[in-house]
Swiss-Prot record:
Lineage, uppermost ranks: Eukaryota, Metazoa, Ecdysozoa, Arthropoda, Hexapoda
Protein known as: Paired box pox-meso protein
DNA-binding region: 9-135
GO CC annotations, alphabetized: nucleus
Biased composition (Low complexity): 160-182
Region ranges (Disordered): 139-212, 236-257
Broad class of where this protein is predominantly found: nucleus
GO molecular-function term, one example from the UniProt record: DNA-binding transcription factor activity, RNA polymerase II-specific
GO BP: any one term: larval somatic muscle development
Region span, PAI subdomain: 12-68
Gene it is expressed from: Poxm
Length: 370
């Protein structure tokens, strides 16, 4: 059968030499011939060359015949009947709520398997994706601001807000707990609030920072030492120094080494609760500087009095001081200038406080610089 006798004389010529009209369906006689040759077992490529019809047209006609049993073409022009009915949209919403990670092609298979749609009115994968993106896009992005506000409201004055509480719509997202810096997975972290934490940590005193950390001690890891009454008492002292108590009447007494180590360990545990917190690092160095200045003042006052035998900063025992019982542990002349950073670091190492090398160097520099 010659396709030219079935088609009008106007049109275009395809690569096989057949005439076709762009945008118009193939004649019904040609479509029937394609189906008859396919029933005889002829391959689609041979049908295409024999009838001089493009291979895509032959494959499309045969696929529609195998699916629907019809050789008639679809509607010319116009729009397809609406497949995204409210029933289909609601069912897609239910599937998405039950399984948020479901794919569009899985939703299409569920629509067919459960009888919601048939092959004629089932929405395509692109249509289902458009429904998920436009109509149901708000399902995966709903978040409650109460979770962030709950962590911020529990801190009694320890939270920082970038807008000062004027805008209620963004105050929940701007409130961030300072203690959450010590726990990387404890709460949401906003990088654009980093300058607020630095200014707040520099302006806050060591007492407020550690009182706030004591209220949220459960947020820190279990490897750090818990807070004790001795650490809380040492934080309330004016200089925050773990210096041993002086004897009555200005008479100096040599404390027990275990007492020095326990008090220093308690104070260091209170000043260094976390290795990840910016505010704790700043407060620690501020407390070390204050402690060193106060201890230097105590050492100078002891020289003017009855002669205290307690050094401002604990040093390693000297062999000369070990032989003479009444001799002071450290020479009072230029006591602050002759303090060795190495001995100060070794004291903390012997006391059981495992600091890194650069921490000990910074603490010794802050102590000897004053």
């Amino acid at each position: 059968m010659d396709p030219e006798s079935q088609c009008p004389q106007y049109g275009e010529v395809n690569q096989l030499g057949g005439v076709f009209v762009n945008g118009r369906p193939l004649p019904n006689a040609t479509r029937m011939r394609i189906v008859e040759l396919a029933r005889l077992g002829i391959r689609p490529c041979d049908i295409s060359r024999q009838l001089r019809v493009s291979h895509g047209c032959v494959s499309k006609i045969l696929a529609r015949y195998h699916e629907t049993g019809s050789i008639l073409p679809g509607a010319i022009g116009g729009s397809k009947p609406r497949v995204t009915t409210p029933k289909v949209v609601n069912y897609i919403r239910e599937l998405k709520q039950r399984d948020p990670g479901i794919f569009a092609w899985e939703i299409r298979d569920r629509l067919l398997s459960e009888g919601i749609c048939d092959k004629t009115n089932v929405p395509s994968v692109s249509s289902i994706s458009r429904i998920l993106r436009n109509k149901l896009g708000s399902l995966g992005h709903q978040h409650t601001p109460g979770t962030v506000m709950g962590s911020g409201s529990s801190s009694g004055g320890g939270s920082v807000s970038s807008n000062g509480g004027q805008n209620n719509g963004t105050s929940a997202s701007n409130n961030i707990n300072l203690s959450n810096l010590g726990n990387p997975g404890g709460g949401p972290h906003h990088p654009h609030h980093h300058h607020h934490h630095q200014s707040a940590a520099a302006a806050a005193s060591a007492h407020h920072v550690h009182a706030h950390a004591h209220a949220h001690a459960h947020l820190y890891n279990s490897i750090y030492q818990p807070y004790s009454a001795a650490a809380a008492y040492s934080m309330k002292t004016p200089c925050g120094s773990p210096s041993p108590p002086q004897g009555a009447g200005g008479q100096g007494s040599v404390p027990h080494p275990h007492q020095l180590r326990s008090v220093a360990a308690a104070a260091a545990a209170a000043h260094w609760p976390s290795s990840h917190s910016v505010s704790d690092i700043l407060a620690h160095h501020q407390a070390v500087a204050l402690r060193a200045s106060c201890q230097v003042g105590v050492g100078v006052g002891g020289m003017g009095g009855m002669g205290s035998t307690v050094s401002p900063l604990p040093m390693t025992p000297s062999p000369v001081a070990g032989t003479a019982g009444g001799q002071p542990l450290l020479d009072c002349e230029g006591g602050a200038g002759q303090q060795s950073p190495y001995n100060y670091y070794m004291y903390f190492q012997n006391g059981g406080m495992h600091h890194h090398h650069h921490h000990g160097g910074m603490m010794a520099a802050g102590a000897t610089g004053l």
